[in-house]
A protein has these predicted regions:
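C-terminal helical "lid" subdomain and adjoining coupling/linker elements of P-loop NTPases
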Residues: 147-152
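Conserved phosphate-donor/acceptor-positioning beta-strand/loop module used by diverse small-molecule
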Residues: 62-86, 90-98
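RNA pseudouridine synthases
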Residues: 43-46, 56-62
Length: 152
């Protein structure tokens, strides 16, 4: 978990405001996020769905029928996974992972005013290296079945 730097520039929190197409700000990052948030909320209100990233846990924080999961793995495991998918050296894979995680963290902090890797933001945190991808998915499925008393 990272410690917030109080000298970082202030972050913005999602308000749900949508900017209309005729506005000069329509193509802003802020407006793109707001439209993504609207779509995420609309989907979650209408049907069961799995949303990876995009601050979905924060956007849906006031909904009862949601499971917020943070799936992670030690950097050594992430490096192995990246190297299995791409022809990168260990150093290159680690650099790529750090860059992606930095972007994820900054994006999450900017729109939610929270820390991406803070376990308190999620009801379920899982180290995927312990069970592997398939068993981790089964674990999450079992959790959903127990929480909502349903059979998937």
């Amino acid at each position: 978990m990272t410690v917030p730097d109080f000298f970082d520039p202030p972050t913005r929190q999602y308000t749900g405001e949508l900017i209309p197409p005729e506005s000069n700000d329509f193509i802003s990052d802020e407006n793109l996020f707001n439209y993504q948030a609207k779509i995420i909320r609309d989907l979650a209100e209408k049907q069961s769905c799995i949303i990876v990233g995009r601050c979905a846990d924060f956007i849906l924080r006031d909904m009862d029928n949601v499971v917020d999961a943070f799936i992670w793995a030690p950097v050594t495991e992430c490096i192995k996974n990246v190297m299995a998918l791409e022809p990168l050296s260990e150093k290159e894979a680690e650099k790529k992972i750090k860059k992606i995680n930095k972007h994820r963290s900054e994006y999450y902090r900017y729109y939610s005013c929270r820390e991406w890797d803070d376990y308190r933001n999620y009801e379920l945190c899982l180290d995927s290296s312990r069970l592997g991808f398939e068993k981790s998915a089964e674990y999450i499925k079992a959790y959903v079945e127990i929480k909502f008393d349903i059979k998937l």
